[in-house]
């Protein structure tokens, strides 16, 4: 049997082909290290698979920052994250990498980021209005269209990686640890993204995917927000994940997708997939979520959650969808800004990387900036005494 049919991104296909090699050749990247003594850790914010995250103070200017201390992984992966963050620095709603230092204790790299006053997404998502959802989805799309236009796929879009400072209506797309450069025809690792947000291409082991993977993940986020069902596709493992998707999108379109790309399905699916009809999106509407759902929301969702990655809306196409007309109208009226002028303060992250367990924040830590504890000598490797209650 011949292999799978190749696929190419519909947009930004050759971005990296036309860039100089040092733009995407992250393995050859030479990291410029900052001074770790500039930062004092205040409290632990959380931990994930690949890192531990702290709130810290930059003692040279007294500004709050977030420090992500990377766990020992391949140097290549660390360089990739750094190169991507440097390439994207200054882009709309992309978390700003402020510095790179070495943790003096572990000798592992630590990434220093702007600070985001984040609201826990599980609490926040339950309070958002229809307009809020449109607004924040549009802000995520700005970040995605930008990174895609720069030849980069995020590959881990999920609520944990979207920091929202709701008070200032500020959003940042964070955790670029799984992000990768797109090269047409390249086969990528399918062990990316988090289960509930994995696109069908990953679940059927199709490796020649592209930016459109991020659009599926965004669709999962949208569905969970408008239907108030978190997560929307709740699989117990990667195989069950595809079954959950098939129970909504139907098995007929799944088999069309498999046939189109000549994909060989894992035999484990034979006993679990069954036959399912395509469900109408309206069936997920009920009295508790109907105020968040509109015909244009369902049309938009339908154009994101497609098996065939080539038929999903691109980020730019998504921004032009009628669902966002009220947002576009307001932003053009306000000159493209999403808030009053003068509020360009940097955005605290409660979850600076994938799968992190959030740590409760003691209220006493609210205004540590001027406290004597901070001015005590506290280098990057040693959390301050006042923060002891915030560590796990």
From Swiss-Prot:
Q: Name one GO cellular component term.
A: nucleus
Q: Offer an example of a GO molecular function term for this protein.
A: protein serine/threonine kinase activity
> InterPro entries from the entry?
CK2_alpha (IPR045216), Kinase-like_dom_sf (IPR011009), Prot_kinase_dom (IPR000719), Protein_kinase_ATP_BS (IPR017441), Ser/Thr_kinase_AS (IPR008271)
Active site, per annotation: 156
* Cross-referenced Pfam families: Pkinase
What job does this protein perform? Catalytic subunit of a constitutively active serine/threonine-protein kinase complex that phosphorylates a large number of substrates containing acidic residues C-terminal to the phosphorylated serine or threonine. Regulates numerous cellular processes, such as cell cycle progression, apoptosis and transcription, as well as viral infection. May act as a regulatory node which integrates and coordinates numerous signals leading to an appropriate cellular response.
Enumerate the residues binding ATP: 45-53, 68
Compositional bias per record (Low complexity), positions renumbered to this chain: 337-354
Subunit architecture? Tetramer composed of an alpha chain, an alpha' and two beta chains.
Similarity field = Belongs to the protein kinase superfamily. Ser/Thr protein kinase family. CK2 subfamily.
Q: What is its EC number?
A: 2.7.11.1
Q: Which UniProt keywords apply?
A: ATP-binding, Kinase, Nucleotide-binding, Nucleus, Serine/threonine-protein kinase, Transferase, Wnt signaling pathway
SUPFAM superfamilies listed in its UniProt record: Protein kinase-like (PK-like)
| Family matches, as PROSITE patterns | PROTEIN_KINASE_ATP, PROTEIN_KINASE_DOM, PROTEIN_KINASE_ST
Which reaction does this chain catalyze? L-seryl-[protein] + ATP = O-phospho-L-seryl-[protein] + ADP + H(+); L-threonyl-[protein] + ATP = O-phospho-L-threonyl-[protein] + ADP + H(+)
Q: Region (Disordered) spans which residues?
A: 334-355
What is the uppermost EC class here? transferase
Q: Which organism is it from?
A: Xenopus laevis (African clawed frog)
* Protein name according to UniProt: Casein kinase II subunit alpha
């Amino acid at each position: 049997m011949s292999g799978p049919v190749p696929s190419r991104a519909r947009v930004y296909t050759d971005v990296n082909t036309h860039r100089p090699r040092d733009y995407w050749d992250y393995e050859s990247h030479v990291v410029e290290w900052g001074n770790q003594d500039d930062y004092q850790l205040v409290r632990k914010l959380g931990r994930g698979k690949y890192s531990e995250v702290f709130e810290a103070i930059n003692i040279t200017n007294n500004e709050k920052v977030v420090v992500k201390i990377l766990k020992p992984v391949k140097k290549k992966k660390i360089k990739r994250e750094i190169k991507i963050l440097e390439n994207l620095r200054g882009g709309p709603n992309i978390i700003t990498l402020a510095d790179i230092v070495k943790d003096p204790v572990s000798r592992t790299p630590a990434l220093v980021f702007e600070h985001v006053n984040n609201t826990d997404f599980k609490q926040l998502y339950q309070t958002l209005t229809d307009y809020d959802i449109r607004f924040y989805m549009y802000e995520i799309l700005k970040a995605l269209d930008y990174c895609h236009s720069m030849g980069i796929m995020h590959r881990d879009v999920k609520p944990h990686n979207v920091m929202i400072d709701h008070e200032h209506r500020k959003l940042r797309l964070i955790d670029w640890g799984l992000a990768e450069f797109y090269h047409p025809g390249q086969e990528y690792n399918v062990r990316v993204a988090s289960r509930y947000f994995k696109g069908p291409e990953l679940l059927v082991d199709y490796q020649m995917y592209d930016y459109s993977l991020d659009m599926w993940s965004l669709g999962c986020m949208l569905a969970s927000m408008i239907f108030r069902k978190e997560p929307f596709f709740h699989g117990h493992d990667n195989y069950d994940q595809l079954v959950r998707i098939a129970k909504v999108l139907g098995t007929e379109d799944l088999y069309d997708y498999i046939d189109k790309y000549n994909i060989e399905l894992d035999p484990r699916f034979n006993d679990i997939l069954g036959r399912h009809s395509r469900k109408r999106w309206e069936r997920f509407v009920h009295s508790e979520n109907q105020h968040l759902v509109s015909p244009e929301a369902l049309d938009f969702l339908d154009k994101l959650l497609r098996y065939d990655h080539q038929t999903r809306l691109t980020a730019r196409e998504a921004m032009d969808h009628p669902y966002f007309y009220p947002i576009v109208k307001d932003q053009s009226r306000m000159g493209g800004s999403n808030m009053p002028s003068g509020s360009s303060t940097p955005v605290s992250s409660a979850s600076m990387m994938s799968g992190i367990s959030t740590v409760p924040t003691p209220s006493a830590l609210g205004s540590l900036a001027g406290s004597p504890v901070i001015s005590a000598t506290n280098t990057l490797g040693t959390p301050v005494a006042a923060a002891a209650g915030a560590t796990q």
